[in-house]
A protein has these predicted regions:
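Active-site loop/turn elements of alpha/beta-hydrolase fold enzymes
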Residues: 60-62, 103, 158-160
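A short helix->loop->beta-strand "cap" motif at the edges of active sites that frequently abuts
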Residues: 93-98, 153
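Substrate-gating cap/lid alpha-helix
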Residues: 110-158
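Alpha-helix N-cap and loop-to-helix initiation/capping positions
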Residues: 72-79, 128-139, 173, 177, ...
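Histidine-centered active-site loop/cap adjacent to the catalytic His
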Residues: 2, 40, 44-47, 145, ...
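Short catalytic/ligand-binding loop motif for oxyanion handling, primarily in non-cytosolic enzymes
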Residues: 15-17, 65-67, 107-111, 163-165
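Short, flexible, mixed-charge acidic loops at enzyme active sites
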Residues: 22, 110-120, 164-172
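Conserved SGNH/GDSL esterase-like catalytic core that processes O-acyl groups on lipids
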Residues: 1-86, 90
């Protein structure tokens, strides 16, 4: 019998989400710092299936992008999609409800030096690193949303919650490194998850 809990598997964004329960269901945090989807998949049996939860939130692929050589990014993202699909089917095969979540975009590090470099980059017509990362995040997010609808999988669309009008991370929802999530960001996410994951 399922124990009624929700496991959250992901990387450091997931690891840092201080949510102990969602709608009175205990949340078991299995975020792993710096992990890519291949590493999440490798421990999925041990950290998700073996715990016999009611559902699993599968969230996070940004390290696949961070760690990839730009010249190989398309191959890497092909594998990212395969890894996410495999986690979904492993959960379903064990009677655990998979819940997919979109990745959040990033913003430049806060600081004058970063602002100046970003400005110079724009003048030179170069795509900034965060624009490159965010473009790839958006590509996979679009795939996740379509995949979720097509396969009737519940979705937590986290990206727009933390985004500014340009689709990058809003400053108030970012840690100073521009990548990790501020306490205010996590608060917004928790309220949203409670609303979205109410039992039908």
């Amino acid at each position: 019998k399922k124990n009624g809990s929700i496991v959250m598997i992901g990387a450091s964004y997931a690891e840092g989400w201080p949510v102990s329960q969602i709608n009175d269901k205990p949340v078991v945090n299995k975020g792993g710092y710096g992990e890519k989807t291949a590493e999440m998949l490798a421990r999925f049996q041990r950290d998700v299936i073996d715990l016999n939860p009611e559902s699993v939130i599968i969230w996070g692929f940004i390290n696949d992008i961070f760690d990839a050589n730009r010249s190989r990014i398309d191959t890497v993202l092909h594998q990212t999609r395969a890894n996410l699909r495999e986690m979904v089917s492993m959960a379903q095969a064990s009677g655990i409800e998979p819940i997919l979540a979109t990745e959040v975009t990033i913003r430049p590090q806060s600081g004058l030096k970063e602002a100046v470099l970003g400005f110079i980059g724009k003048l030179l017509g170069k795509q900034s690193y965060q624009d490159y990362v965010n473009q790839k995040v958006t590509t996979i997010n679009d795939w996740i949303k379509t995949y979720a609808v097509t396969n009737q999988i519940r979705l937590l669309d986290l990206q727009p919650l933390l985004a500014d009008e340009n689709g990058a991370r809003a400053k108030k929802y970012a840690a100073p490194d521009g990548s990790h999530i501020s306490p205010a960001g996590y608060n917004v996410m928790t309220r949203y998850a409670e609303h979205e994951l109410q039992s039908e």
